């Protein structure tokens, strides 16, 4: 089946975003299909982070639409959009273990300890860090810390 016959995982249509009365994004269009990998490249300040923050619901669009799996998400609460951002500054909690960092949002949601432990194991498998629950953040490489941040974002 050709990519164009599938519903896009992400579709951005005519997106306009302004910050402090200055238009940052003007009529941005982007379509990403399942299995595709893309890169956003450009100089500092050109709107890459603004675009991602808008998709994730951290910034509001003035016009246009953002669809995830065919459904518009602009009017959805941030936590229901199915989009997360892992920032360049990973903001991991250095005093917590890998497990503690990943389960942080799960605790806030009131998820039981057994379910949290299971979800942490699943997420560590997904990010290729199995069995590292008890490791301290300062014992990890930069790449491993990025994967912990990704697992934490997926847990949220």
Q: Model regions: which residues?
A:
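Conserved ABC ATPase signature
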Residues: 136-140, 144
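Helix-to-loop junction immediately C-terminal to a conserved catalytic motif
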Residues: 56
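Short coil-to-helix segment of the ABC ATPase nucleotide-binding domain corresponding to the Q-loop/switch region
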Residues: 96-104
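Conserved ABC ATPase "signature" region
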Residues: 107, 114-132
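The feature captures the beta-strand-to-loop junction immediately N-terminal to the Walker
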Residues: 41-43
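ABC ATPase NBD coupling module
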Residues: 72-87, 108, 113-117
């Amino acid at each position: 089946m050709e990519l164009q016959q599938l519903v896009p995982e992400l579709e951005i249509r005519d997106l306009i975003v302004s910050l402090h009365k200055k238009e940052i994004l003007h009529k941005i269009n982007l379509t990403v299909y399942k299995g595709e990998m893309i890169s956003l490249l450009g100089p500092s300040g050109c709107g890459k982070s603004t675009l991602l923050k808008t998709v994730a619901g951290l910034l509001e669009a003035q016009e246009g639409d953002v669809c995830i799996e065919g459904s518009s998400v602009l009017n959805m609460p941030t936590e229901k959009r199915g989009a997360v951002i892992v920032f360049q500054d990973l903001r991991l909690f250095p005093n917590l273990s890998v497990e503690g960092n990943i389960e942080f949002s799960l605790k806030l949601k009131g998820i039981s300890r057994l379910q949290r432990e299971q979800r942490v194991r699943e997420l560590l498998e997904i990010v290729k860090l199995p069995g590292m629950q008890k490791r301290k953040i300062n014992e990890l490489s930069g790449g491993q810390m990025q994967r912990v941040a990704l697992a934490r974002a997926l847990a949220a």
